[in-house]
Regions:
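Sec-dependent signal peptide recognition
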Residues: 2-7
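Low-complexity, intrinsically disordered segments exposed to solvent
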Residues: 17-270
Length: 270
């Protein structure tokens, strides 16, 4: 998303300069920085959700084995306690140690702990992830990430409620960005290959909000479901409404690659 928003931000700045009541240059720069920070933080927490679900699915697959520890040459060590198919809640520990270069080219380190009340496909199951000195590349991740299985929708696709509370991402420079989320993810492709997250596609609806490193508040509301693909990572379609500082009702349309600012429509390239 960051590659998409970079040209968008240039348009935002241009649009801001056309308004008489716009903030000064410093405020404009802080607004742009806040949006750029959002793209990084959002990507990190979406990644947490994807990999957390993968860890729970992998744990279920291996629960009939004889070892509670799963080690991979190119992945983390996953520990499941209690290690059986029926006892819940389970604590699933995903340990990246001092650093693992994963299949998607991202280096992760530290520990993600997931407490699951049932298996990932079980309706009503909740999966609560917390972090112990966990890093996505050089960004430290904190907060509580909860996924709840809401069951099948009318199209027979699984829906999951996602809540992120007290989300915090600290950059290598020491500055921190705060983030929260209340969304619904609909699993529309890849559910028949549960051990391979890279063919997954999902629709995202709901709200996200946060505070930038400079204290700029922002909120984003999905107007039309965002269609995410994981490999190559991107947004295929959907409409996102953005309110940030004094810049309100910006619409980013990923379906036709346009952005609306102050009623003016501009194209962008994805």
């Amino acid at each position: 998303m960051k590659k998409i928003l970079v040209p968008i931000l240039a348009i935002v700045l241009m649009g801001c300069q056309e308004k008489e009541n716009v903030n000064n240059d410093t405020a404009q720069q802080q607004t742009i920085a806040a949006l750029l920070e959002y793209t990084v933080v959002n990507k990190i927490f979406q990644d947490v959700g994807n990999n957390g679900g993968d860890a729970v699915l992998s744990s279920e697959s291996s629960a009939s084995g004889k070892s509670s520890v799963k080690s991979e040459v190119d992945g983390p060590t996953i520990t499941v306690e209690p290690f059986d198919l029926t006892s819940f809640p389970k604590t699933i520990t995903v340990d990246y140690g001092t650093g693992v270069l994963c299949q998607d080219g991202i280096t992760r380190k530290g520990i993600v702990t997931i407490v699951s009340t049932g298996w990932y496909r079980s309706v009503g199951s909740k999966h609560t992830a917390t972090f112990d000195n966990y890093y996505h590349e050089n960004f430290k991740v904190e907060g509580t990430h909860v996924v709840e299985n809401l069951g099948l929708n009318q199209d027979n696709n699984l829906e999951y409620g996602v809540t992120i509370a007290d989300g915090k991402v600290t950059a290598p420079t020491g500055v921190a960005v705060y983030y929260s989320e209340n969304t619904t993810r609909t699993w529309i492709a890849g559910s028949d290959t549960p051990l391979n997250i890279w063919d997954d596609e999902y629709l995202l609806n709901g709200n996200q909000s946060g505070v930038s490193a400079a204290g700029v508040e922002y909120s984003l509301t999905v107007e039309e479901a965002l269609h995410f693909i994981l490999l190559p990572r991107g947004i295929e379609s959907g409409i996102l409404d953005v309110d940030i500082a004094d810049l309100n009702d910006v619409k980013i349309n990923f379906t036709n690659n346009t952005i609306t600012i102050f009623g003016q429509i501009y194209p962008f390239s994805s």
